[in-house]
Structure formats: C-alpha cells, structure tokens
Amino acid sequence: MDMIRPFGTLRMTDVEIVGGKNASIGEMIQGLAQADVRVPGGFATTADAFRLFLRENQIEEKINAKLQALDVNDVNALVAAGKEIRGWVEEARLPAALEDAIRQAYGEMGDDPDVAVRSSATAEDLPEASFAGQQETFLNVRGIEEVLNHVKLVFASLYNDRAISYRVHHNFEHSEVALSAGVQRMVRTDLGVSGVAFTLDTESGFRDAVFVTSSYGLGEMVVQGAVNPDEFFVYKPALEQGKKAVLRRTRGSKQKKMIYAEAGGVKTVDVDEAEQRAFSLSDDDLTELARQCVTIEKHYGRPMDIEWGKDGRDVQIYILQARPETVQSRAGRTLERFELTGKGDVLVEGRAVGSRIGAGVVRVVKSLDQMDSVQDGDILVADMTDPDWEPVMKRASAIVTNRGGRTCHAAIIARELGIPAVVGTGNATRELHNGDEVTVSCAEGDTGYVYAGRLDFHVNRVELDAMPEVGMKIMMNVASPDRAFSFAALPNEGVGLARVEFIISNVIGIHPRALLDYPDVPADVKAQIEEKTAGYASPRDFFREKLAEGVASIAAAFAPKPVIVRLSDFKSNEYHHLIGGPAYEPTEENPMIGFRGASRYRSADFAEAFALECQAMKQVRDDMGLTNVQLMIPFVRTVAEGQRILEILAANGLTQRENDLKVIMMCEVPSNALLADQFLDLFDGFSIGSNDLTQLTLALDRDSGLVADMFDEQNEAVLALMGMAIKAAKAKGKYVGICGQGPSDHPALAQWLMDQGIDSVSLNPDSVLSTWLHLAGEQA
C-alpha cells in the first residue's frame, strides 16, 4: 500500500488515489513540462493512507454515525458536528508508515523547504462537481514537524462545515470521499504577484479569451475575495498568431497583500500606494501566463480554472494547480437573458458575477455565528464571504460583498448556485441595512448594481438552435465593450454599429485635447487626469489603449463576423461634459447640425485628437489582427468632405482596402441619398442612420420635446430617401445596411427594408430576437 506518491508519478487516471487536485498537478508535471508549463514539484499522500489513518485511530465509524444523523440545513447543528469531528481528527496520530514516508519525501525536497500543504478530495474537481475551496490550503509551512501537523489539519478539513453540507447537497456519500494532502514547493509569490485564470469568460462562457485576475503577494487573497484584484482578458487567436493579445485591463484597488510571516505561516500587510495605482502584470507576463493556460486547456480538452503565481525572485510564471471549469462548461444552447424593466436609485455598485437579477430583503452578516439569520430569498450582504458560508449562500437570492473579485470562492459558488453576486463594492455593509428591500442586477455588463426597492424585470429564453432563416442579415448595435461577449451569444451576423462614444465617455471620460495638452492644463483637470490614467505610460497612451481595448473587445467577441466601428460622433455639448471639455468646446445654438462627425476630423483644432482615434483603430487591426473591424464615417455633408476624410485616414495609416480595410459611410444627411452615386464611388458602402436622416429630412430637432410627436422614421419622405440610397448601393454592388433606432422600434419598418433588398438591419440587442422572429413570421 503506497502512503505517498511523488507528483511526477501521477496522471489524471490517479484521481481515486490522490484526488482531483493532486492528480492534475501530476498530470501537468508529467504531460506538459516539455511544453514549458512550469509546475512546482512535491508529493501527495494517498487515499489509502487517509483511510488507514481513520481506521488505526478508530474514528471512521464514529464520524459516519455523526454525519448520518445530521440535518445539514440546521446551521447550528452543522457547526457543532463539524467542530466535534475535526477535533477527533486533529487529536489522532498519523500511522507510523505514513509519517515515515512523509519524512523521507520532505527530506528529499531539500533543507527544510517552505511548502504549501493542499487538500485534494477524491471527488473534487470532477467535471460535474466543483468542490472549489471545500477543504483547506496552508501556505509557507516549513520543517518536518510543521508539515506533519498540517497534513493532519488538511485531513480534518474534509469535515469543514461547508464540505459536509456540499457533499450532502450534491449527493456524495461521506464515506466514499477520501482526502489526499499535497505537499508542494512554494513559489515566492509573496515577493511577486499571483491570482486565478479561467480559459473562458466566466460570465458569458465566451471561449476565445483567457480571463485573468491578479494581485500582489500570495494568491489566497484573490481566492478568498479579501482583495479587489486587477482583471485582464487575453485574446486566444491573437496569442496563437503572435499578435498583441491583451484585450482589456481593469485596475483593481489591491489594498492588501499576504506575505510570509517571520516565524512561518503568513500575514497580511498594506500595499504601497504606488503599487496600488499600477497594474500588477505587464503585457509580457500576461502573454506568457495565457500561453501556459491555453496549453493546459488544449491538453485537458476543456475549459480550465487555474491558480498561478509569479515568483518575485526568479520572475517566472508558475502554475500552482488547475481544475476543470464547471459552470459555463455545463451551459446548454438555451439563451437566458435577464432585463431590468423597473427603475430605482443605485445604492452600491461593484463587479458583476453572472448575468441574472435577484430581489429580496437585505440580511447583513458580519460573522459565521450570524449565518442562521439568513432566510430563503434574502440578499446576503457581507464584508467578504468565505467558503464556510456555503451552507447559507444557497438560501440567498443574491450576494453582495465589500471585497473580492470575480474569481474568488464566493463568485465561483454564486455562479454554481445560479444566483447573481456583486463583489468588491467597498461599502455594501455600510450602505445597505437589514430589512431593506433591494434588487441586485448583474444583467448590465461588468458592473453590478444594487437598486433600492423590488424592481420589475423579465427573462427571455430562446433555443439558439431553433432560430428560423430570414431574408437578410440581422446585425447588432453595440456600445458597451463589457457586454460584447454576452451579446455575441445572441443570433447575429456581426455588428452593424459599434459606437466608440460609450468608450470615450464612460471608460476614458477625458476630453482628448486635455490629454494631449497635459500637463499644461488647470490643476483640477491635471489631478483628475493623473487619477484616471494611473497604470499607463502617458495620458496619450491611456486614450489610445483604452479606445483600442474597447473596440478590440467588441471585435473579438464577434470575430470573424464584420464589426463596423463608427468613429466618434460627439456633438460639442457632449464633448463639453468630459473632463477638461469646457476649455475646448464652442457653445453652439444647435449642436445637432454643428461641429460634429467628419467636419471635426478635418478641423485643424481636432486633427491631433482624431489622429489618436486612428492610432487606436490601427492597433486593433494591425497589431491585434482583428481585421474584421471596418470603419464608418459619420455625418459627411459633401462629396468633397468625404474625399478629404479618406485622405486623412490614409495619412494616419488607415488606407482604404489595404489589409482588407473597408470604409463605410453613414447615410444620414439628405445629400448622401440625393448624391448616393457620387458618395458610393468613394466609400465601400452605406449604413443608413435613420435617426439623423429623419431629423434632417423633416427639419425636426431630435433634442426638442416640442416637436417630438412628429418624429417618424416611417414618414414617406424619409422612406423615399432610404429607398434611393438602397437602390443606388444595389446598382453599384456595394453594401447597404441600416443602424438607426427605427427597425428596433418598428418591426414593420424592418420588413419594408427587407422588401427593398437591404443587406442588413442592425438592431439594439434587446430587440434582436423579437424582430428576427417577426421577420421570419412575415416570410412564412
């Protein structure tokens, strides 16, 4: 009977011997070392050794009897039983044969090396069961006596309250689950950084990205949810092509880190402010980490959940453990979309986990002994949650925490339970009070919101494999990059309108000319710029990188389908609201027909700002390889202006038809339809902007409520101009679509456009399914 097995002798076929976690470590050491996946070595105790331990100490039957009589839904009884059983295990002695084997194996690792002692259950990490965090991990364990003691503590952790409850609710017999202790050489992440990576997007299931969370020090802070980490997405196709692959970065607060304590074990300390303001991983680090993660995913043939660390001494990236991802991998082909229809005040916001909505009564829980106060359907609010809280998490309709990121245990369990969670709010326990009725929404992108009151929402469900054919392409209007992955799951033929205004106003938030003039700007503007651009090489780099990240996120989500990116079309009053904006913007009587679109691009005052936009688009297409991005020019008044814009694009490295670059023109000024042949000689196609075309055809100010009742995209004059544009494009064999609000609001207009032979309609995501089915019904 083997008492221990070196990691290097293990494969995934040994799960029954050393549990899922340790078998996976062995699999990577044996199977992936040649692929330069770096995994620290060590050894594992066996399931046989654990069972021998229980038998020799005559506690096996006693434990089983206690558990058989336990009602795990009685939280107080669960806590008492777990504590008693763990006491029996901790007081027991390790069998002599096991102790001798551990002494020898640890001795062979060197002179009292610091190790992590990890738990690995024999039922853990099977594809259908996530036991994430159910047992303990102990870090910076040094010396044989400490190792022996911590092996016993790991054995006891099989009977943690959360582990007992989890087994019952997932129909595992307690007696059939054994524990293996993994003793693994520590990576000095206390001097570096660490975190968690998933080889898909955890919220949408998007498979072409690696999602990484990262913070300073030992990884337990990220796993426990004790810190708000940095977040990154890395694009797999770009990685494989050797292109710039980092899709998106979000800087976390990273206020604390866990490091070695002087006498062994660990302690938590504050992170320097300069480190908090910087990103914890460079692009080179992210590329190397993602490469190892993708290699692991390919080896296992399924999405993976991976803990990693960067050693602060040798600055290498190491893989600490890997397990199958168990939530999105089980998702079927039925699309479920939650949509908030009611309105309320936002009380707190944080990182969204999942894409659902939940409503209920707030229950603030400050410690484990308050767990039994949580009733079915409550909103569980806490500073942070620990896997120990799992027995009551399943009662909640939503979870809200002050701390934590989207890869902490609380987030993983919330996803598995199918309930929304908003983590890392910073102030939930202060702003939310027991008895408050609230609605928790994770259906609005990366940011999750807690609203006052019980708000109305509805759920749309559709079988994706059952969508009927329609006679034209249904595309989508997308503004928010952080919703692109989930929007891409809807039936679609690409993006007919990607709006960069959302990225500039909501993500960048600073007038581009203020960034260009930095540091020669007013003191208050300078301070705001420095705060927002922390972590980037310069304010200019911040603008270019953030705009590129936003566009790339949308383009990657829908690739290889076309993504038509409309370059900025802010009006002067809209630019005025950005940080630093008032110094650069004129006061116009009617900005709707003023300094906007193409006229801005050719203005000497705006030329350098437009060049930044062009640099971002060039980065997305050339450096990241996302050549599905097509450019669209808004509000072109004259043919000469259109020609000038193409020259400006070329001067900025965006030459039409080079590297398959298509440049589309918005058809939204009546002159565009009236002189369609001339405009189409210049551009690769039209996208009809029904909002502005209606405004300018009927001489109606879209911003004026006094004439709003006359605004009608289906007015015969507007339809006549649309018809002219479609006919001209068809005659020249050029693309013609529509991206205005009209078809989203009026399915009959979409039907009329289809009858005219338009190539595509681009709809708001919330109207894609209804319009698609309406058009299919009209055809039937």
UniProtKB/Swiss-Prot annotation:
Record: residues binding Mg(2+): 668, 692
Family matches, as Pfam families: PEP-utilizers (PF00391), PEP-utilizers_C (PF02896), PPDK_N (PF01326)
Miscellaneous comment as given in the Swiss-Prot or TrEMBL entry: The reaction takes place in three steps, mediated by a phosphocarrier histidine residue located on the surface of the central domain. The two first partial reactions are catalyzed at an active site located on the N-terminal domain, and the third partial reaction is catalyzed at an active site located on the C-terminal domain. For catalytic turnover, the central domain swivels from the concave surface of the N-terminal domain to that of the C-terminal domain.
Catalytic machinery residues: 409 (tele-phosphohistidine intermediate)
Gene it is expressed from: ppsA
Name the UniProt record assigns to this protein: Phosphoenolpyruvate synthase
Kinase as UniProt keyword: yes
Gene Ontology MF term list: ATP binding; metal ion binding; pyruvate, water dikinase activity
Species annotation: Deinococcus radiodurans (strain ATCC 13939 / DSM 20539 / JCM 16871 / CCUG 27074 / LMG 4051 / NBRC 15346 / NCIMB 9279 / VKM B-1422 / R1)
